[in-house]
Amino acid sequence: MYNETPIKRRPSTRIYVGNVPIGDGAPIAVQSMTNTKTTDVEATVAQIRALEKVGADIVRVSVPTMDAAEAFKLIKQSVSVPLVADIHFDYRIALKVAEYGVDCLRINPGNIGNEERIRSVVECARDKNIPIRIGVNGGSLEKDLMDKYKEPTPEALLESAMRHVDILDRLNFDQFKVSVKASDVFLAVESYRLLAKQIRQPLHLGITEAGGARAGAVKSAVGLGMLLAEGIGDTLRISLAADPVEEIKVGFDILKSLRIRSRGINFIACPSCSRQEFDVISTVNELERRLEDVTTAMDVSIIGCVVNGPGEALVSHIGLTGGHRKSGYYDEGERQKERFDNDNLVDSLEAKIRAKASQMANRIQVKDTTE
């Protein structure tokens, strides 16, 4: 498949969230956030494990109270994925979760308090080698900035971010990343563009409060796609009013679409029409469901007829082209003698895809050990 990419990543410094490298050319990390009550340790741990299962690199957990901080201690002991503590209003909560091994602290400049409080958080983070995310949000800008700009603007978000970047600079603390999120695509995109020109720290991308599963995914894909295509962004979170697991899936789909980072199967499927020789939609849906556990990056084309089928199969790892009663099967662009019965496509394709994924994974492993 044609995969030449003109995308040149923005140069940035390197930090680590747990064992996950961020910035300086590291793979763009995909993260989500739990939506359980943090004090419900069992439910929160279960959700974090579900996120880890679908590929989450980092998980953020809201810690609104000291009781939640105590719960965070137990949660941290129960999972292996790096955790970010989301802190608002009370800086003392940040100090407490730092004692419990948090991997990153997210603080909101709009409500964390004065510079002295920030200094306390920074000194604690420095002592324990914990990075910080300065998380600016268009919905919670500082009052003086709202008075100055009257509404959230790219300049307002930038000023909020930079005043806190300056504080960290004065404190000689450089282990941080920054985000300037907004629910409006154009506001967020322009804010990130301005910020990218001002600093070299890693940038965490997101369209905040993007909406439900469908609309939020589209809005995030448009906004983040614009930034990623310009080389901006080192981590991302898709904010959906939906199961957090969907955020991880959409995040990887966006990166996969831009050929930035691939995980799992990239299904190339026609929308179907009266020429289809089998039910394309149900076939693809069932294969997606069955093959969610496959992490090997591969392209699979499933086309219902011979108009575009052979051409798509030519540039896929595995291809299927609809035919009368039996459909043609391709491996690495080569037409195979084997044909699949249209009434048993899903089982046949699942077996072939799993075998191919295993073969490709072994090939990568051998290559890595010989280099």
Swiss-Prot record:
Cofactor(s) required for function per UniProt: [4Fe-4S] cluster
Enzyme Commission number: 1.17.7.3
UniProt keywords, alphabetically: 4Fe-4S, Iron, Iron-sulfur, Isoprene biosynthesis, Metal-binding, Oxidoreductase
SUPFAM superfamilies, per the entry: Dihydropteroate synthetase-like, Nitrite and sulphite reductase 4Fe-4S domain-like
GO molecular function (one): 4-hydroxy-3-methylbut-2-enyl-diphosphate synthase activity (flavodoxin)
Gene3D superfamilies listed in its UniProt record: Dihydropteroate synthase-like, Sulfite Reductase Hemoprotein, domain 1
Residues binding [4Fe-4S] cluster: 270, 273, 305, 312
Gene Ontology biological-process annotations: isopentenyl diphosphate biosynthetic process, methylerythritol 4-phosphate pathway; terpenoid biosynthetic process
Catalytic activity from the UniProt record: (2E)-4-hydroxy-3-methylbut-2-enyl diphosphate + oxidized [flavodoxin] + H2O + 2 H(+) = 2-C-methyl-D-erythritol 2,4-cyclic diphosphate + reduced [flavodoxin]
UniProt keyword annotation of 4Fe-4S present: yes
Superkingdom, natural source: Bacteria
Family recorded in the similarity comment: Belongs to the IspG family.
Role summary: Converts 2C-methyl-D-erythritol 2,4-cyclodiphosphate (ME-2,4cPP) into 1-hydroxy-2-methyl-2-(E)-butenyl 4-diphosphate.
Name of this chain's protein: 4-hydroxy-3-methylbut-2-en-1-yl diphosphate synthase (flavodoxin)
Species annotation: Shewanella oneidensis (strain ATCC 700550 / JCM 31522 / CIP 106686 / LMG 19005 / NCIMB 14063 / MR-1)
